[in-house]
Amino acid sequence: MHDLVIRGGTIVDGSGTAAFVGDIAIDGMTISAVGGVISAGREEIDATGLVVTPGFVDVHTHYDGQATWDSEMAPSSWHGVTTLIMGNCGVGFAPARPDRHDWLIGLMEGVEDIPGTALAEGMRWNWESFPEYLDALEQLPRTVDVGTHVHHGAVRAYVLGERECPGAVPTAADIAAMADIVEDGVRAGALGFSTSRTVLHKSVDGELVPGTTATAEELVEIGRAMGRVGHGVFEMASDLRREWNEFVWMGQLSRETGLPVTFAALQSIAKELPLSEQIATMRDENVKGANIVAQIALRGN
């Protein structure tokens, strides 16, 4: 007898094969059988008329604050998501000096419209460095798995302090310090690094996020830090202005480090390049040996 049988559901197994009606048996933490009629289970779920799939991986979320206090991770866990990735778009809460907590909250509130009052009341700030933030996440049991990137906004605020403002130009020493923080974060368990370079992303005070005015040199040096580790994803939201030549440096970075670079491929009023040109330019760089991957939204824009 199996521990659990999910019976009569329409199974989409993720392999690319056509959906089929069948049963799924689970024993312990293992799916032990998939297919036709399966013997009885100690617990059975009638999934007739329902779709049964592997858990969804949501690669672009902003649970950075909520993940420090909420075990349920709603609403994602309500909709079949079993793994979620946060720390996108260059916004998050580590590293964090005590005098920059409010600034980081204002950045997240402005970019993602998450109420600052909820973040201020929910987060305990029992971390300063990025590895300490990962430790804080590890302390809380939750219903889904989480992963996170190191966030550009927090890194710049940590290194530049009060000098951080739109258009601030970090010194070579500043850039080296930022690269070291990112390298330490990835070695500690971060999945990669994220930044934002779009005028649509502003703090609650209306200021552009730090990555929008960052130079390609700064971003490439941070990417090289992940290259030294040997793994990591470089994630970016960008307006893709033609004069920025984003795909040129993304391609160079990917070829140099061997790491993937991913960007938000959207048909947006803020993007100068139409979606078709974004994809075509990405493919041109990939033909040259880069590994640039487009993040596509599942809803229309």
Q: What is each stretch, according to the model?
A:
Residues 1-5, 11-55:
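Histidine-rich, glycine-flanked metal-binding segment
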Residues 131-142, 167-301:
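Histidine/acidic residue-rich metal-binding segments in metalloenzymes
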Residues 53-62, 164-167, 265-267:
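Short, basic, glycine/proline-bearing loop/turn elements
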Residues 9, 29, 49, 60, ...:
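Divalent metal-coordination and catalytic microenvironments
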Residues 62-65, 89-92, 240-242, 267-269:
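Acidic, glycine-rich active-site loops and adjacent beta-strand->loop/helix elements
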Residues 51-75:
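Di-metal (Zn2+ and/or Mg2+/Mn2+) metal-binding site signature of metallo-dependent hydrolases
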Residues 1-2, 40-42, 48, 52-54, ...:
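Short coil/turn connectors at secondary-structure junctions
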